[in-house]
């Protein structure tokens, strides 16, 4: 260990050049043998970094000042982020190459964590405008009752300036000049949604108490508290606080990918005995795509632990439920799998933490011919893919969606097939 390394401690400021990108919106620098992960830094930045955490072989830092910006860095396109909100950490990134940049990070995670030495060609899907794409936002409320985004790595509320992600009209009268906006209960949260029918809903909620998972909706400020979302011509009516894809075009794009990929396979049994699993399936927004990919043969078992989502799915897909083409199970994936008939096809869309090795192993050992795995975190997606590989599956297709432009996040979808 060098003398310089011994002197690095929390609060130290060092000058570095960012050499590579790291998962999670970080840049990588080297400083006297240590790897330095700098939050919000882009390859090519020369900057002063404020050390926040120190380990033997690496340290973490934030940007103190940028001495020479990377060619990738442009003017911040989000006023909220420019004022300290944590919404658009990639708001300064060149949007023309943002999707490819994220795809390269996915490939790096697949190689390093997923042990995929020869990944398939990675398709990149960008949805056009880098702003005005988000249909739902969760806002904090400050002591004066003003709504706004949360500051980066903080619960402090940045009010008065709207985030550029919101679709047209989403935050009108909610976030903006003080004299023109509604006031809310201090300490509450505000959920604002503009649904697929163009209707805006605004609800005030109280965060869930410590140890509880479900928040309480305390006041409907605008609309009915319900939102209507459309996929494959089916309208799902959900609580405003329920889960739905953030990007206005994402849900349909993912359903189209499922239909395309499963439709291209040669399925060994396409009679009425075909079984598909739709795991972490929400309201069943992908179930119609799965069925249409196999010409409506067989049955889709949709597993979801949230009762409100299951109820919404049963209402929206009532005819298919009545015909027993779609069967909903209000249960966790881990508990439901032992009760389901063996699948031919599987779709799984786990939360950000991933499905995990034990769950992937159980799905793989249930004997599907193919699976479509969806992930919103490159690292956990890669770890799940590694477990698929250990259980005899190969990653055949890969598609990265820049579904969260202006942020370091992306959505990744992979097609896995059983090795011969």
UniProtKB/Swiss-Prot annotation:
Show the PROSITE patterns listed in the entry.
Answer: SAM_MT_RNA_M5U, TRAM, TRMA_1
UniProt-annotated catalytic positions:
376
Which EC class is the enzyme in? transferase
What GO terms describe the biological role, i.e. biological process, of this protein?
A: rRNA base methylation
Q: What Enzyme Commission number(s) does the record list for this chain?
A: 2.1.1.-
Q: Which UniProt keywords apply?
A: Methyltransferase, S-adenosyl-L-methionine, Transferase
Q: Tell me the SUPFAM superfamilies matching this sequence.
A: Nucleic acid-binding proteins (SSF50249), S-adenosyl-L-methionine-dependent methyltransferases (SSF53335)
Q: Where does S-adenosyl-L-methionine bind?
A: 245, 280, 304, 349
Identify the Pfam families for this entry. TRAM, tRNA_U5-meth_tr
State the source organism's domain of life: Bacteria
Domain TRAM, which positions?
7-65
Q: Which GO terms describe its molecular function?
A: rRNA (uridine-C5-)-methyltransferase activity
State the family named in the UniProt similarity comment for this chain.
Belongs to the class I-like SAM-binding methyltransferase superfamily. RNA M5U methyltransferase family.
Q: What is this protein called?
A: Uncharacterized RNA methyltransferase DIP1398
What organism, scientifically named, is this protein from?
Corynebacterium diphtheriae (strain ATCC 700971 / NCTC 13129 / Biotype gravis)
């Amino acid at each position: 260990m060098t003398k310089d390394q011994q002197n690095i401690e929390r609060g130290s400021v060092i000058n570095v050049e960012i050499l590579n990108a790291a998962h999670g919106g970080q840049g990588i620098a080297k400083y006297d043998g240590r790897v330095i992960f700098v939050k919000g830094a882009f390859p090519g930045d020369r900057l002063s970094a404020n050390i926040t955490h120190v380990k033997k072989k690496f340290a973490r830092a934030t940007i103190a000042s940028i001495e020479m910006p990377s060619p990738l860095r442009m003017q911040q396109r989000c006023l909220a982020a420019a004022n300290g909100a944590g919404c658009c950490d990639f708001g300064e990134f060149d949007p023309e190459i943002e999707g490819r940049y994220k795809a390269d990070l996915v490939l790096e995670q697949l190689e390093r964590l997923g042990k995929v030495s020869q990944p398939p060609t990675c398709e990149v899907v960008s949805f056009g405008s880098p702003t005005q794409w988000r249909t739902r936002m969760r806002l904090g409320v400050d002591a004066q009752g003003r709504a706004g985004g949360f500051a980066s790595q903080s619960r402090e509320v940045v009010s008065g300036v709207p985030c550029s992600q919101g679709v047209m009209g989403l935050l009108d009268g909610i976030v903006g000049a003080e004299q023109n906006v509604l006031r809310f209960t201090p300490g509450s949260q505000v959920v604002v949604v503009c649904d697929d029918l163009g209707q805006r809903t605004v609800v005030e909620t109280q965060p869930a108490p410590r140890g509880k998972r479900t928040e309480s909706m305390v006041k409907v400020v605008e609309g009915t508290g319900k939102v209507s979302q459309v996929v494959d011509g089916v309208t799902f009516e959900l609580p405003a606080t329920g889960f739905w894809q953030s990007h206005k075009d994402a849900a349909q794009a993912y359903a189209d990918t499922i239909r395309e990929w499963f439709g291209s396979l040669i399925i060994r049994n396409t009679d009425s005995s075909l079984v598909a699993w739709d795991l972490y399936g929400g309201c069943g927004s992908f179930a119609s795509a799965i069925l249409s990919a196999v010409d409506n043969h067989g049955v889709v078992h949709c597993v979801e632990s949230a009762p409100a989502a299951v109820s919404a799915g049963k209402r929206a897909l009532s005819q298919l439920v009545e015909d027993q083409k779609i069967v909903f199970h209000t249960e966790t994936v881990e508990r439901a799998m032992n009760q389901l008939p063996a699948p031919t096809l599987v779709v799984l869309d786990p939360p950000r933490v991933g499905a995990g090795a034990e769950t992937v192993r159980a799905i793989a050992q249930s004997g599907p011919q193919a699976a479509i795995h969806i992930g919103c975190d490159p690292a956990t997606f890669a770890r799940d893919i590694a477990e698929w590989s250990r259980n005899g599956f190969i990653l055949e297709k890969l598609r990265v969606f820049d579904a969260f432009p202006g942020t370091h996040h992306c959505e990744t979808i992979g097609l896995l097939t059983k090795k011969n």
